[in-house]
Amino acid sequence: MDQETIDTDYDVIVLGTGITECILSGLLSVDGKKVLHIDKQDHYGGEAASVTLSQLYEKFKQNPISKEERESKFGKDRDWNVDLIPKFLMANGELTNILIHTDVTRYVDFKQVSGSYVFKQGKIYKVPANEIEAISSPLMGIFEKRRMKKFLEWISSYKEDDLSTHQGLDLDKNTMDEVYYKFGLGNSTKEFIGHAMALWTNDDYLQQPARPSFERILLYCQSVARYGKSPYLYPMYGLGELPQGFARLSAIYGGTYMLDTPIDEVLYKKDTGKFEGVKTKLGTFKAPLVIADPTYFPEKCKSTGQRVIRAICILNHPVPNTSNADSLQIIIPQSQLGRKSDIYVAIVSDAHNVCSKGHYLAIISTIIETDKPHIELEPAFKLLGPIEEKFMGIAELFEPREDGSKDNIYLSRSYDASSHFESMTDDVKDIYFRVTGHPLVLKQRQEQEKQ
């Protein structure tokens, strides 16, 4: 990029091209803000990039195999787009809404994930996608199925302003455990509703007011209803397409991008100590505020106390007992293994253009609870059958120490162990509110803007 042509003054500087940062730069550009977006790395995605097989070996293996051996086993490098952080989109979730409203769906194609499964007593079972599937599900006995059907009917017919639909329950006063009790649901049903539908990672939610759980279960049911089969969507060519889609949105609205540009120095105003700009090899750039991922300001972040282990597994066969599904999610609830946190397994395949023909990618993640984290993943490995290659990494989770108002430095959170993007979009909305002073209201792009 020719230094002569680059402006030096902006409304916002964004550091890092993770999905959180790219959504925010896209939204702020649409709002008319002049955005400069910089990444020290030479590719989009930050911690949540999609990488080729050779990059994967480079990142995780001490002694990578030769190119010849790799290609004879796994095919061409260009056929691989492997997510470093596994997540699916809820079909009716907030990220999908943002994609549709900003029209980023023009740049990214999606495919439905074939199924959602839950682990129970050593086997995996399909999570019922609706009342009809609940009736035929082997997860429950005949009387429990009726109770489950009534529970799902209550969820779908509940109206806030119609007390007759409330069944005597107050979502803000009754706990979720009391809701389950009202419908007479047993422990194993509570487990798969709470973990495979509401997608809670532990059981703390049982003693909390029911509303957040109600909303999560409703989101799950509405997401399933949108396309059938499962509530999840996944982008063709991997999750790395999402930051790039929002980067294109930002560029259409005048955003400037610089990859492979390390930050040499952060500048602060002498009198107030607030953010003033950054120095790079391409020059000095100024803006009244910055949005960044935690790696740019480690001193302004603190550990959440949690570490996540993720294992990327290459298979040359579908996962056993899943009807040869080309993609699925398996949730292993914590109580099944005597753990505090669930284990998630996300499986995609060549149907999504993320690996060479005949291969499958299974990515396992959980919050570490012992000093032997790789052993914690053993139950998930067993479900996959023979594994051709395995890459394992551990990430500490960080969050900002302050809200950014003092120094105008607004930091995103690390990507958690959850299997979907809802917590990430909460972070987007939270940062957007702190930066602009008003809540994010999604507006459809104007037709003339789409040209």
Swiss-Prot record:
Which compartment or compartments is the protein found in? Answer: Cytoplasm
Example GO CC term: the record gives: cytosol
**Where are the residues of the annotated region Interaction with YPT1?**
106-112, 234-259
What is the recorded function of this protein according to its Swiss-Prot or TrEMBL entry?
A: Regulates the GDP/GTP exchange reaction of SEC4 by inhibiting the dissociation of GDP from it, and the subsequent binding of GTP to SEC4. Plays an essential role in the yeast secretory pathway. Extracts GDP-bound YPT7 from vacuolar membranes, antagonizing vacuolar membrane fusion.
| Listed name of the protein | Rab GDP-dissociation inhibitor
Q: What is the lineage of its organism?
A: Eukaryota, Fungi, Dikarya, Ascomycota, Saccharomycotina
| Top-rank lineage group of the source organism | Eukaryota
Oligomeric and partner information: Interacts with the GDP-bound form of Rab GTPase YPT1. Interacts with YPT10.
Major subcellular location class? cytoplasm
Organism, as annotated: Saccharomyces cerevisiae (strain ATCC 204508 / S288c) (Baker's yeast)
Key words of the record:
Cytoplasm, GTPase activation, Protein transport, Transport
Family membership noted in the UniProt record: Belongs to the Rab GDI family.
PANTHER family linked to this entry: RAB GDP DISSOCIATION INHIBITOR, RAB GDP-DISSOCIATION INHIBITOR
Q: Which molecular-function annotations from GO does this UniProt entry contain?
A: GTPase activator activity; Rab GDP-dissociation inhibitor activity
Q: What else is known?
A: Present with 7280 molecules/cell in log phase SD medium.
InterPro entries membership: FAD/NAD-bd_sf, GDP_dissociation_inhibitor, RabGDI
Q: Output one GO BP term.
A: small GTPase-mediated signal transduction
